């Protein structure tokens, strides 16, 4: 690809980039910092939050007990932020905003990955459901208790809208999932602070969203190979990974399997990043946005895979779902994790006094929906390890996740 027009940290910000000097501000007004932009302050608040530290002990596919080298939500988040920042720099966007959205995007995930989310959503169906993106919003607007003047982190409008809409509009003609109901916590907050749910998020948020796809597509392969759930031979069945493996084997015919896997992963990240940059440049040239408002008003995302890469990526995802996420050994752990969280929900909902004092306080005055949301907030904030410990404390038998 050509490096013409690529930003490397010294080029002027593009006219369609978010300008921190023109931020729409915060829900609770605050004095500006003399040393940091609003987006830098958002990033720093996210990094110093309790929710960020908890990501260290929350897993994605592999349960934490399996080993120290598998990715957690924290390591995944750092990898997403690195890719998002690289994309933003190349497209001459605000790197700090892209990084902030990337760093906060997984705050609302439960223990035990998507299994935990499914378990909580099952128990919360009668009370508005549970959605990790909506939970991320609750954390940064309500559940973090660090500041004297407000609950949450009081992030800028741009970071909040990027968090909520990084995968596309939630309502209207261009909604990413038009048949899906918007989670109640998002609708409730939107009444207080309009995040323009029918419009596309900033290019910085779009960079964070696609960086998430790039990161987990590659790194789940890395973890799957390490765990022995995937093999290089099996990856030869996937067009994208076969092409990359052929390149590696041609250049390094005697390379051992472990390094071959690493070479595959790094090449996959590189080729996807380069594809996104090239496709984004093509879409930007066609759309000719001259402002952030022009970006918001588009009918489609401007940061995206090319048609060819999107097809390859879908095939890869189908392969990973079949061979990794629903591998027999992973499914066994998923069932165990599911039972742990559902047991904890049922017990805490029936008897809130078993929760820590700050969570049980005032539960006796709450209606069922509010009490269920309180329990879901408590459980969603747990790490994998803490959820297992609590289950062992409360029950005679805890499913084995090892």
From Swiss-Prot:
CDD domains, per database record: HDc
Residues forming coiled coils: none
This protein's UniProt keywords: Hydrolase
Single GO term (MF): triphosphoric monoester hydrolase activity
Domain HD: 73-217
PANTHER family: BIS(5'-NUCLEOSYL)-TETRAPHOSPHATASE, SYMMETRICAL, SLR1885 PROTEIN
Family: Belongs to the dGTPase family. Type 2 subfamily.
Protein name, as recorded: Deoxyguanosinetriphosphate triphosphohydrolase-like protein
């Amino acid at each position: 690809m050509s490096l013409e027009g690529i930003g490397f940290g010294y080029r002027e910000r593009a006219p369609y980039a978010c300008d921190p000097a023109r931020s729409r501000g915060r829900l609770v007004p605050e004095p500006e910092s003399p040393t940091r932009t609003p987006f830098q302050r958002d990033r720093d608040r996210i990094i110093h939050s309790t929710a960020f530290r908890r990501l260290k002990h929350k897993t994605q596919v592999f349960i934490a007990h399996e080993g120290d080298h598998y990715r957690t939500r924290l390591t995944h988040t750092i990898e997403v932020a690195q890719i998002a920042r690289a994309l933003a720099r190349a497209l001459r966007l605000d790197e700090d905003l892209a990084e902030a959205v990337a760093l906060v995007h997984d705050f609302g995930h439960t223990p035990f990955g998507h299994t935990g989310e499914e378990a909580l959503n099952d128990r919360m169906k009668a009370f508005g459901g549970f959605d990790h993106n909506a939970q991320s919003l609750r954390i940064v607007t309500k559940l973090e208790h660090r500041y004297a003047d407000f609950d949450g982190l009081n992030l800028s409008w741009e970071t909040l809208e990027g968090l909520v809409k990084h995968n596309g509009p939630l309502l209207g003609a261009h909604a990413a999932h038009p048949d899906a109901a918007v989670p109640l916590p998002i609708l409730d907050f939107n009444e207080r602070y309009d995040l323009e749910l029918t419009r596309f998020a900033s290019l910085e948020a779009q960079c964070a969203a696609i960086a998430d796809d790039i990161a987990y597509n590659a790194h789940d392969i890395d973890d799957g190979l390490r765990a022995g759930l995937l093999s290089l031979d099996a990856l030869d069945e996937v067009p994208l990974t076969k092409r990359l493996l052929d390149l590696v084997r041609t250049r390094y015919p005697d390379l051992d399997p472990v390094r071959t896997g690493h070479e595959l992963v790094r090449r996959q990240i590189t080729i996807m990043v380069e594809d996104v940059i090239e496709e984004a440049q093509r879409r930007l040239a066609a759309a000719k946005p001259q402002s952030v408002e022009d970006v918001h008003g588009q009918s489609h995302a401007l940061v995206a895979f090319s048609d060819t890469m999107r097809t390859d990526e879908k095939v890869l995802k189908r392969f990973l779902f079949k061979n990794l996420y629903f591998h027999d050994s992973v499914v066994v752990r998923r069932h165990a994790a599911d039972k742990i969280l559902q047991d904890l929900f049922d017990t805490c909902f029936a008897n809130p006094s078993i929760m820590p004092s700050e969570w049980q306080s005032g539960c006796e005055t709450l209606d069922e929906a509010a009490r269920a949301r309180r329990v879901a907030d408590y459980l969603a904030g747990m790490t994998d390890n803490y959820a297992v410990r609590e289950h062992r404390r409360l029950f005679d038998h805890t499913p084995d996740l090892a």
